[in-house]
Each structure stands twice: as structure tokens, then as C-alpha cells.
Amino acid sequence: MCGIVGFTAPGQDPAAAKQIVRGMADLIRHRGPDGEGCYADGTAALGHRRLSVIDPAGGGQPMLNEDGTLVVVFNGEIYNYKTLRARLQQRGHTFATDSDTEVLLHGYEEWGRDLPRRLRGMFAFAVWDRTRGTLFCARDLFGIKPLCYYKKGETLLFASEIKAFLAHPAFEKRLNEARLPDWLSMEYLPDAETLFTGVYELPPAHTLTWQAGRVTLARYAAPRFRAKRGRSLRAWAREIGDAVAESADAHRIADVEVGCFLSGGVDSSLITCEMTRRQPAVQCFSVGYAEEAYSELPAARAAARALGVPLTETTVTAEDFFAANRAIQWYLDEPMPNPAEVPLYFLCRAARQRVKVVLSGEGADELFGGYPLYRQAVWAERWQKMPRAVRRALAALLPGCGLLRRGALPRWQRSARANYVFETTQERDKYLKRDYRAPTPAQRCKPYFDAVRGLDEPTAVQWVDWQTWLPRDILRKADRMSMAHSLELRVPFLDRQVLAAAQALPRRYRCTGRRGKVALRAAAARRLPPQLADAPKRGFPVPLADWLRQEKYYALVRAKLTGPVAERFFDTGALCALLDAHRAGKTNAMTKLWAFYCFIEWYEVYFTGKIPPDL
């Protein structure tokens, strides 16, 4: 795992370009404290910060081919690199290192722009082709590894993290204020835009090509659900179990020790179980709180005992939680008000003290139907199939039922992700200082639903999550919180082979109206004790709602909600009324309050210069 940066600027001075690209790389040094390197010529410059995991002695970057016509920088891991290396050697390529980076270099020589579709792994890389004057970038199938870009005239900047652009003189730092309403509703932007004007994320499974000042994006893979019928749940459980086991084994590849995150849920327990087959005493890590009702430590301890693995526990206090948030917003690049990022930050810090790589369970819910949202979609679909007269009668009988109210809307408007923080745009807009006249979040999501009109509703919602929620929330949080501590986090569920099994599953084996991850739990039951295979989903529960009612943290948050940043963007009177109602127990406004608080902290870091001094 590493950090990559670079830019194109035809006619540049190579010496000056090296200084700039080195400065960009220094801003993401947390991604790679083990080494650095840079390259520059009259058109392009590439930089790299290295976290050495495979071939520590020989994998330095930027890496050039034999005649110096190709230069590559790479962040991630290629799990089938040995297979590809052997294939390339058969075609006459010679290798000077044992690294997966060199496989990318020779793979590009051999296959060109078809290279990404041959890769199994998590990756973001850039290849500068001096002969053709072409910069070619690619991002992995799921968006596990980040890559953002910014274009101004003929100059293109790219980096693992947006903050690297701050060191380039062509970058104009401006808030993309038009998208603030979308962000407030969803906690993220569902498309490629960011909260920095002109900065975009390269979408998952896409390539970017720069040549002569022009940028072209292309999709190289498009995962689709294609259910296979006529197989039993037992047969599916066997196939999925085998795919997950093989993926976990592939994700072990490293020249350093690999650990596991263990929460006690089925996802992390299954990954840990597979790890113990080759590494019986795998180091495991969990996080929790002194407030036991919110802590997953008891469940993690029980899982560790059942699996026979050592467990390192981390406890987060309210003081820790609030004190770390400013640094967390710096590492995230864009504000993220998901409270789960904070315990993850501390969990990664604890793990890095013992190991350099961890396996984690992200992606299982999205692939195998684990979220309540998917079960709600089952019921919404059933509601739509009822006779209209029955629906009218039920709606009249239960006028306040949210399911019935949403069920009357078109599919693309029913998505709970579009109104995750605020149930309606009207409720959201009363806190904003100006009228943005923006499309609703549901309208932003409509193109994704339009692309999968032929799928049943739960499957369509899953697919939209793959394109939006997974890369823009779940994986961004996992990447940034782990890289903040120079820890490589790998996600075995998000693998090509596991995906092949997941997208062939009939919907009834993913989720029903009452149960999620049906087939995955059946697969886990073949390997885990029943209490682990059937463990309820917990996520990262946080006692934040309780803390916001304590005088110390109430006062801290109120100060932010009435400060100069809040005054610029929000109705501070409405914010304080919301905070007071929460404190009095009249409502649980934790999610809304934390969203406003995180935006303000993030804005202070990136736009008023309040960067934590110890970063």
C-alpha cells in the first residue's frame, strides 16, 4: 500500500517539477513512510510514498521499464501477480524485481489499456508513456483504492488523496458549495464530484487517459447480477464458502505479518476463521467503549475464544472521540459524518503497533444483501404488487406508516440512502442559509436506478450501493482511517472470485423480507459455531447521542454551531434549537448534529488553516 501523485504540464522544467511533485507526495507521507521517489521530464511528473509489504528491497517507485519509455506509480496489491508474471515471462519479458509493481509495468507493455481487466486485487496506478505522450490511470473494480484528479487547461493533477493538490501551484482550492445540500442529505456525494470544485474521483472500474491536454474516461468492467436458478442453498453455501476461503488465502500474500479485525459479527469471524487455517495464532483487533451497551468488545472476546486467536482490545472514550475528529477530517479529504470512522481510526492505530497489514470484512453486506435497506426493498416491492384497492385501504388505515408512504413513490425515490440524514429536502433546507435550488438527492441517484430497471427492487438497490455507497462511504472510510496510521487494510469479500458467486445468487438467497445474507450465513455455518454464523449485524455502534447530552460536549458542539463557519452556511438559530431538543430528549438528532459539526471542523481544517499541528 502506498500513496501516488503526479501531474502533466507540457513544457515544464523537470527540476522544478520534481520539487513540486515531491511536495505533493510529502502531504500524503502517512500512506508510505518507508520510502519515497519521484520522476520528472518536460511533460509529466510522478511521485510515490511507499509502505513496503511485498519485496521490500526491490519494489521502489516510480519504476521504469528497461528503455525508460514507461514510468509507473502504483498503490495497492495485485493478488494474481505471480500468475501474470509467469505469463509475461513466457512472452519474453524479463523481471528485475519480485514486486507486483513490475508486473504492471510489463503488463502494460504487453496488453496496454486491457491490463486492468486482467488484474485481481485492489489498485490505483498511473503509467506515463513517454513515446506516445500518454498518461494512463486505472482504478480497481470496487474502488477499494482511491484516485482523484483535477484538470486546468493542459495540466492534469492526480493523487491518492485530494490534499496532495494543495502543494501544486495550478490548484485553485474552492468549496463546491452547490453540492452541500446533497452532502448534508447523504453524508457523501453519490457521483464522481467532490466538495472541492473541479476535483473528481475516478470511478471504480474506470480508466483515465490524458493525451495532448485531453482527458478521456472509459469503463473496463460492469458487474451485473445474473441469477442462476435450480441450485439449492446448500450448493450455494459451498460455492460461496470456497470462494471466500480462496480469497482470504490470496489476501494473505505479504512479506510482513498479517492480522485481522474481529468484531464478533459473521463477516469478520468468517475471514478470521479462514486465516487461522494457515496462520493459527493470527493477531486480531477490536474496538469498543466503556459504555457496554454500545461496545462490540464482549462479542469480539467471545469470537476470539471460539476461534482460538489472541485479541488486542482498544477502548475509545468521549474525550478521545472529540479530540481526534479534526485530524480525522484532515485524513478524510472530504467531510464524513459517519461516527463509525472514529472508532475505526483508533482500531487502526492499535493494529499498526503490532502488524502492517490487516484483513477486514467490508463489502459483505453490499455483495450478499446484509443491510436492512434491502429487506425494506423486499417489502416495498411486495407492496407495489398488491391490488391498488388494497393499497388504498391500508394507506388510509395506517396513514403514518413510512413503508406505505415510501411504497407509493417511484423506485428511485424510495431509496433510503438518498435521505439518510434528513427524511425530506424541506427538513434539510430549513437549516441552510441560502436557497441552492439543487436537484434532490433522489434525483441525483435516479440515473443509477435507470441503469438497472430490469432488476427486482432489492437487487437494484444493492447494485446502486455498489456504485455509490460502497466506494464513496465504506471504502473511503476504510482506506483513509487505515492509511492515517500507515496500515494496509485488505478486504477479501471484495474480490473478483467472490463477486462472481455473489452476482449469480438468486435474490432469495441474498435477502428476504426478514433475513439478510442468507447464503453467506449458510456458508459461515459450515465453518463457524452457530453463535458466530448467526450473529446479528452491529456495525460500529457509537454512544454519541448520549455524549451530546452531557454538558461538556453539548457546550463544545454548541460553540461550533454558533461560530463563524456555521454563520456563513447555516441558520445557527435552527441548529441550536435542534441541539437543545436533542439534549432535552425530545428527539434523537445525533446524525444531523454530527453532520453539521463534521462539516464545520472539515471546513476549518481545509479553508481556514486550522490543520492539527502534529500531523
Positions of PLM-derived features:
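Short secondary-structure boundary/capping segments
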Residues: Q329-W330, P372-W379, P612-D614
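Acceptor-substrate binding/catalytic loop of class I
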Residues: E334-N338
